[in-house]
Amino acid sequence: MNNKHLTIYWGEELGRYGFGEEHPLGQDRLAAFRVAAISAGIDRSVEIAAPMACNVTDLILFHEPAYVQRVEEQSTIGRGYLDCGDTPAYPGIYDAGRFVVGTGLAAISRIMEHNWHRAFVRIG
């Protein structure tokens, strides 16, 4: 496979977004993907890009400001849930989420600017 038109984002910032071993979106999934990709040689045939954080203005384009503030507060407290019981809060979830959102926005932006053909953000 030789496809430099595909960019894969990975970095430890994205790996911080996860909800523990018991949750389907555990923090170990990104590291497992990276190990498998390197093992298969995928990292040598695509462009690798670093994660990027978004700002609060980006977040409130989708979420109500009160919810963004609540997530930031829950991130400091480090417990409770961000929704009806499926998304646990943990210390640092706000900043981890900013990297997930910012990376997705950066990938879309680069594609729309015709710098890349495809991008892959392995987080969900």
Language-model features: locations:
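HDAC/HDAC-like amidohydrolase catalytic core signature
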Residues: 1-124
